[in-house]
């Protein structure tokens, strides 16, 4: 069974009152859109973002997703564009998720998929708890019974072929996809939603999300250390870039000592072992491998745990080559691989004052520390 997700990132956020669309505003240390994208990418086979590629692409760096497609004037136009883009991949199930919803529980997708064994669609929903009033202006006209009323949330799940056919048969669709199925006589199930699954529409919503995340996320600290000896005849790769030097570093992979230390720090913070556990040096498949693959995997593990990288601090220890001239490029590359902004990454260098193997210019050592926020 192949599962795809459409991440709808259109809309200008006019009700939010900001020049920046709400889905691009920072919350919990990263753009709003990235929270949902990371949670989806850890659960589905295909992630299809819909919106302005120039705006979205930088915010999704490091995540595995399909080429971004342009959205439409209305939300349903954007969903249709995402569905058509998924046709060549023939998914069995498609999830539709609003980029303005940064959080949903891990069990939501499992609940939705289970419901699709019987129904053509399923949505998470929360029963309406407040008393509802119908009014004309500021004058109450009547009380609306709340029994049987629910607040719909996303992600919503549908059988791909059913939803695609309905969008093609009804251009413009309905106000939402569940309504489209309901109007066509298809059954749509409700699964339990979550009060924390907040859609950011107004400025106060952003504050609610920030408070919720600060309460539900806890910091995890990890450290990593690695060392490689110099070896003639190899390129010197440090923090994902090639550094001019007359020697490279010896190792089974490309021997990127900086990335290796950083990976160990991340795995340590997640209590998931070290780089050797995930990429054993005894396996031929990792011979001369680009260590960027290792760091991308570490970033994916953060996302799979529903967390985010708060910051990373890396120190390279060597007499030569000089690191400082290359530090900005190193920071940019690490930020790209981890899918974070450059202000979350620090790369600096020191020497051992001519002492030890680094002092004798026999190799390079690296020390890393990270703080990762994960759900409590």
From Swiss-Prot:
Residues 220-376 are annotated as: 2-C-methyl-D-erythritol 2,4-cyclodiphosphate synthase. A divalent metal cation binds at residues 226, 228, 260. It comes from the Bacteria. The record marks 15, 22, 252, 351 as: Transition state stabilizer. Its cofactor is a divalent metal cation. One of its GO terms (molecular function) is 2-C-methyl-D-erythritol 4-phosphate cytidylyltransferase activity. GO terms for biological process: isopentenyl diphosphate biosynthetic process, methylerythritol 4-phosphate pathway; terpenoid biosynthetic process. Keywords: Isoprene biosynthesis, Lyase, Metal-binding, Multifunctional enzyme, Nucleotidyltransferase, Transferase. It catalyses: 2-C-methyl-D-erythritol 4-phosphate + CTP + H(+) = 4-CDP-2-C-methyl-D-erythritol + diphosphate; 4-CDP-2-C-methyl-D-erythritol 2-phosphate = 2-C-methyl-D-erythritol 2,4-cyclic diphosphate + CMP. InterPro entries: IspD, IspD/F, IspD/TarI, ISPD_synthase_CS, MECDP_synthase, MECDP_synthase_CS, MECDP_synthase_sf, Nucleotide-diphossugar_trans. Its EC number is 2.7.7.60, 4.6.1.12. 4-CDP-2-C-methyl-D-erythritol 2-phosphate binds at residues 226-228, 252-253, 274-276, 350-353, 357, 360. Pfam families: IspD, YgbB. The record marks 146, 199 as: Positions MEP for the nucleophilic attack. Pathway: Isoprenoid biosynthesis; isopentenyl diphosphate biosynthesis via DXP pathway; isopentenyl diphosphate from 1-deoxy-D-xylulose 5-phosphate: step 2/6; Isoprenoid biosynthesis; isopentenyl diphosphate biosynthesis via DXP pathway; isopentenyl diphosphate from 1-deoxy-D-xylulose 5-phosphate: step 4/6. Residues 1-220 are annotated as: 2-C-methyl-D-erythritol 4-phosphate cytidylyltransferase. In the N-terminal section; belongs to the IspD/TarI cytidylyltransferase family. IspD subfamily. HAMAP family: IspD, IspDF, IspF. Bifunctional enzyme that catalyzes the formation of 4-diphosphocytidyl-2-C-methyl-D-erythritol from CTP and 2-C-methyl-D-erythritol 4-phosphate (MEP) (IspD), and catalyzes the conversion of 4-diphosphocytidyl-2-C-methyl-D-erythritol 2-phosphate (CDP-ME2P) to 2-C-methyl-D-erythritol 2,4-cyclodiphosphate (ME-CPP) with a corresponding release of cytidine 5-monophosphate (CMP) (IspF). PANTHER family: 2-C-METHYL-D-ERYTHRITOL 2,4-CYCLODIPHOSPHATE SYNTHASE, CHLOROPLASTIC. NCBIfam families: ispD (TIGR00453), ispF (TIGR00151), PRK09382.1 (NF006899). This is Bifunctional enzyme IspD/IspF. The lineage of its organism: Bacteria, Pseudomonadati, Pseudomonadota, Alphaproteobacteria, Acetobacterales. The gene is ispDF.
């Amino acid at each position: 069974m192949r599962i795809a997700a459409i991440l709808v990132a259109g809309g200008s956020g006019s009700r939010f009152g900001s020049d920046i669309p709400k889905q691009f505003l920072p919350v919990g240390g990263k753009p709003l859109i990235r929270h949902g994208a990371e949670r989806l990418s850890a659960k589905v086979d295909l992630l299809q973002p819909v919106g302005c590629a120039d705006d979205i692409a930088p915010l999704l760096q490091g995540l595995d997703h399909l080429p971004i497609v342009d959205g439409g004037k209305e939300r349903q136009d954007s969903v249709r564009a995402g569905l058509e883009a998924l046709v060549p991949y023939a998914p069995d199930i498609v999830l539709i998720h609003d980029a303005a919803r940064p959080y949903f529980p891990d069990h939501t997708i499992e609940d939705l998929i289970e419901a699709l064994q019987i129904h053509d669609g399923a949505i998470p929903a929360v029963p309406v708890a407040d008393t509802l009033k119908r009014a004309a202006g500021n004058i109450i006209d009547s009380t609306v019974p709340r029994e049987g009323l629910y607040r719909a949330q996303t992600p919503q799940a549908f059988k791909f072929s059913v939803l695609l056919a309905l969008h093609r048969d009804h251009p413009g669709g309905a106000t939402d996809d569940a309504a489209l199925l309901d109007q066509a006589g298809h059954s749509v199930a409700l699964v339990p939603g979550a009060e924390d699954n907040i859609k950011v529409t107004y400025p106060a919503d952003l504050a609610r999300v920030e408070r919720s995340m600060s309460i539900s996320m806890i910091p995890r600290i990890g450290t990593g250390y690695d060392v490689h000896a110099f070896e003639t005849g190899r390129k010197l790769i440090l923090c994902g870039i090639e550094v001019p030097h007359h020697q490279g570093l010896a190792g089974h992979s490309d021997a990127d000592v900086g990335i290796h230390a950083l990976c160990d720090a991340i795995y340590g913070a997640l209590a998931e072992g070290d780089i050797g556990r995930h990429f054993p040096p005894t396996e031929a498949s990792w011979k001369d491998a680009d260590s960027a693959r290792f760091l991308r995997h570490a970033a994916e593990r953060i996302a799979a745990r529903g967390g985010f990288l708060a910051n990373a601090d890396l120190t390279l220890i060597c007499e030569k080559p000089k690191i400082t001239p290359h530090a900005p490029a190193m920071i940019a590359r690490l930020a790209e691989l981890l899918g974070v902004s450059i202000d979350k990454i620090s790369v600096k260098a020191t020497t051992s004052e001519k002492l030890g193997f680094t002092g004798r210019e026999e190799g390079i050592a690296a020390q890393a520390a990270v703080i990762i926020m994960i759900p409590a």
